[in-house]
Amino acid sequence: MKQFNLAEWALKHKSIIYYFMAVLLTFGIFSYNHMGRMEDPDFTMRTMVVGVAWPGASPQEMSDQVTDKLEEKLRDLPGVDYTKSFTDGSKSVIYINLKENLPSDKIRPAWEEARNMINDEWKSLPQGVQGPTINDRFDDVYGIIYAISGDEYSYEEKRQQAEDLKRQLLSVPNVKKISLIGVQQQTLNVTINKDKLASYKISTQQLLTAIKQQSMMVPAGMITTDTNNVYLRVNGLFDNPQAVQDMPIRINNQTLRLGDMADVTMTYQDPSDPQFYYEGKPAIGIAISMDAGGNNVEFGEAIDKKLAELKKTIPAGLELDQVSNQPHIVKESIGDFSQSLFEAIAIVLLVSFASLGLRTGVVVALTIPVVVSTTFILMYENGIYLHKVSLGALILALGLLVDDAIIVVEMMSVKLEEGWGHFRSATFAYQSTAFPMLSGTLITCAGFLPLALAQGMVAEFTKSLSIVVFMALILSWFASVLVSPVLGYKIIENKAPKPESEWTKRDRIMHNLSVTFYDKFERLLHWALGHHKVVLLITLGAFVLSLLSLPLIKQEFFPSSTRNEIIVSMQFPQSSSIEYTANQAKIIDEHLQGNEHISTFTSYIGQGSPRFVLTLEPELQRNNFLQYVIVTKSLEDRDKLYNELTPYLNEEFPSALVNTQFLQIGPPSKYPVMLRVSGPDQKVVKEIANKVKDKMQGDKDLHNIAFDWPDTEPVANIHIDPNKARLLGIDSYAVSLHLQSLLSGTKSGEYYEGNQTIPVTFRLGDNEQHNLSALSSLPIQTGNGSYVPLSQIATITMTQEDGIIWHRNMMPTISIHANVKAGVLGNAKTKEVYKSLQDIRDSLPTGYTIELDGAAEKSVTAVQNLVTPMPIMLFVIMTILMFQLKRIALMFMALLTAPLGLIGVVLALNITRTPLGFMAILGIIALSGMIIRNSIILLDQIEIHKAEGQKPLEAIINSATLRFRPIMLTAIAAILGMIPLMGSVFWSPLAIAFSGGLLVATVLTLIVLPVMYATWYKIK
C-alpha cells in the first residue's frame, strides 16, 4: 500500500493550505492581543500561615502550651513537608509548608483539612487563647499601590478618603482585592479619675464590667403573631462618644454618670498600629490585587482611567501618589521581550537568506509567522500568559523551529537543481526527510521533558518554557511538511545549475572556497579515522576535564532582577517599641529626601511591604521592624545608591540588623547566605549557632552576620504575695487587670460608626507607662477602693527571656544569615561556608544538624526535582532512536554524543564568567536533545549511503561531508537565534550554556561520531 504523503496532499489542496494560513495568522494576532500579560509566571505558594495570641503569656509558655500543640497536630496533615513556628511574646505564627511534589489541585483540600485540624485541637488549648487567623492566600500580589497623604488631614480623614476610593475601585473589572495599609485604629479612651473612683468605693473590675455590659449586643427576642415574626430591637448601644460619656453606671446601690468620673476622648491606639509613610509623610496605602487570568496592562489602564475620574472628588490638600505600578513594568517587560522576539526572527531570517539564497530563504521566512501565530493560539487556549518565561521560550524555540523547514526546502532545491519538477521534488522531500525530522523534533522536545515533568515551585515558575517549546517544535514539523512544500512549489525556481562556462567571478570564488573547505574537512576526517584512538582519548579527556571544572564555575540559583527598586529591611533590638522604630525612620527619611538617585521611596514601620511582585517575601508584623522600598531613576542609580546606602545604614544604626537587597528573579530568599541549626535542646542549639557565627565572622566576603533568634529581652516579673493581697481583698487577677488598665488600657466595649468598629479602651488616669523606675510605686486599688503602691503587695525582679522562639518541625531552630560583598554570589558562598563547617558538623551531638537554608537549599531541591524525571527523558529518547535507527549500537552512538555538549558549556560559562544556576542547568539538559537530533541526521545518512552500495569508509566520509551543511546551518540558526536572550539577566545563563554547548558538540559530532562508527564496526 502506498504510504500517505502529507506534502502531496497539501500540493493537491493548495487553496486549503492558503486559507488556513490566513486563518491562523488572523487568530494568532487576535490571541497575542488578548492574552494575559504578567511580569513573572504564577507559581503556587504551598504555605499556610496560622496566627494565634495568648495575652499575658511568656514566649516559652506560648510555645509550650499553644504553638507546640498546634504544630504537633498539623504535622499529621497529609502532604505536609515541614512546619515552622515563630513565637514573639504572647503571639505565635505557624507556617505550614506542603511538599513540592504535591499536585496543585491537592493544595486547596489540604488547607481545608488543616483548618479542621486546628478547630479540633483548639478545644485543648488554654482559656484566653485568641484566634486563629488563617491566611492560605499567601501569594496574592498587590501590583498597584497608591499613597494618600496630606499634612492638613488626620489619619482618620485620610482613611475615610481611602475607603471611598476603595469602594469605587472595586467596581473595576478584574479587581480581586483591595487592602489599606497604615490604617491607625481609632479608639475611644475612657480615662478614669482614680481619686473619684476611690471616693465612690468602686473597683476597677466593677466599672469595667458595667461598661462591657452596656456595649454588648444582646438579642431581645421575637414575637410571633398569626402572620409575622416581629424581632425586638432594644436601643442603648453606643452610637457616639457623647453616649459613652452620658452612660449611667449603677454600682453599690448608686447610679452615676460615667462622665462624672472619666474623660472620654477619641484618639488613636497606643502603641500605634503599623505605619506607612510616603517620602517621609504619614500616609494611607491603597494596595490593589488583580484577579488571576487578567491582562496586567489592560488592568492598569482601567485603574488609571477610574482614578483619573476619582481624583476630581479628592479634597484639596490630599495627594494621591503611585507607589508601585506593576502594569507599567509588565508593559515594558513584554515590549522588551517582543522586541527580542522580532530580533530573533530577523537573525534567523538572515541566516536563512545567507545560506539558502533569497527565494529559498523566503519560504523559510514565511513559515515562521505561521508557526508563531499558531503557537500564540495554543497558548491563549491553554491559559499561558505572556511573561518573561513564555516569551523567552518562543525566542529559544525560534532557532529550533526553522530546522525542519530548512531541511525540506534544501532537499527541494537539490532535487530541482537535478532537474526534477516542483511536485516530485516536494513529495520526495517528505518521503526522505519527514520521519527522520519527526524523530529529531520529538527528541529535541524530549530534552525539555524533565522540566515539563518536574514538581515544585521553581519548576512551576519555569514550566511554561517546556510547554511553549513543545508547541512550537511540533507545529514547526507540521508546517514543514504542509506549508513549506506549498510555498516552495510557488516560490523556488526550477533552475538547473549554471554551466561552468557561465560562472561569474563571484561564482568561481565561492566554488573554490567551497571545494577548498570540503577538501580540508575530508582530510581532517581521514586523519581522525586513521587515528581513532587518539581522537576518542582526546574527546574523553576533554569531557572529564569539563566535569572536573564544573565545581570551579560560580553558582547562582537565580540572578537579581533588573528592576529599579532597592529593598531595605531593618530589624532593631527585639525589645524596641514601634515609636522607637518610627523615630529611626525619620532619620533615614531626612537622609533619603532630595537624593539625586531616588525617584520615590516609601517606608513600612512595624510591618513589611505588601507583596507587590510575586518574588517578594512578605514580612511579619513586628514593632522593631522597618522596611523601605526605594525606587531609583535607573539601574545605574540603583547600583550607586546601593553602594552608598549600605555603609551609611550600618554605621548610623550599629544596633540594627540591616539587609539591603534588590528584587529577585525566581522564588524569594531573604538573605544571600543562610544556614540553620536545629536540635532538641534550645541551649545547645544556641551554642552551636554561636560556633557557626564565629566561623563566619572570619570570612571577609560576609557582613551583617546575625541570627533570626535575637538576644534575650528584659522582663519585669511581679511576684504577688498572696497573703498580703488577700488581706487587702484582691488577687493576682485584679492586680493584672489594674496594671493593664493603668499602663496600656483594657478593651471594655465597642462603639460602632458606619462600618467601623471602634474599641472603647478603659484607662486609669495619668500614669507612668513609659517610666520603668516608677513601676514599684504604681497605685493598686484594694478591695475597699483605696490604693496602695505595688511594692506593698509584690516584689519585682528584672530578668531576661527569649523574646522570639523559632521552631522547625517542633525543634528549636536558629537561622544564621549574612550579606555578601559586591560581586560575591550568595549560593556559591553559602556552599563554601557549609563546607568550612565540616569540623563542627562532625562533632555535633546526636539529633543536632547544620543545614543549608534559603536560596542554597531551594536550588538543591529544584535541581533534584529537575533531575528526577531524567530517566523518563532517557527512555523516550532511546525509544525514538530505536524506531528511527533500528539498531542498538547506533542508538548508543547517538546517545554518547550528548555529553559532548558539556565541553562547550564549561568553556562558554568560563569565558563569559556566567554563573551556573537553575537556568544554565536547564539549558544543559535541553541541549542533549538537539545534539542527538544532529547525530540521527548523520547516522541515518551513513546507513542510506551504505544501502546504496557505497563502501563503509566512503559512506562515512560522504555522509559527513553531505550533512555538514544542514547540520551546521541548523546549529548556527539555533545559536544566533539565542543572541537576543543573551542580553536578559534571567535567560542569559541558559542561552550561553546552550549556544556554547551546541557549537562545540556540533563540530565534535561531525568528527567524533564518524570515528565512533568506524571504531565500533572496525572500518579502516
For each feature predicted by the language model, list its residue ranges:
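Signature of alpha-helical transmembrane segments and their immediate interfacial
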Residues: 1-37, 433, 505-558, 603, ...
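Solvent-exposed, membrane-proximal periplasmic/extracellular interface segments of envelope transport
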Residues: 4-6, 61-137, 195-216, 237, ...
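Extracytoplasmic/periplasmic membrane-proximal domains and adjacent transmembrane bundles
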Residues: 9, 18, 51, 122, ...
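Transmembrane helices with small-residue packing motifs
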Residues: 15-16, 23-57, 61, 119-126, ...
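Hydrophobic transmembrane alpha-helices and their membrane-interface caps
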Residues: 28-33, 346-413, 471, 879-963, ...
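Flexible hinge/switch segments at interdomain interfaces of large molecular machines
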Residues: 37-48, 85-90, 128-150, 179-185, ...
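Helix-loop junctions and hydrophobic alpha-helical segments within the transmembrane domains
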Residues: 323, 330, 334, 409, ...
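Transmembrane alpha-helices and their membrane-interface boundaries in multi-pass membrane transporters
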Residues: 398-412, 434-453, 460-507, 628, ...
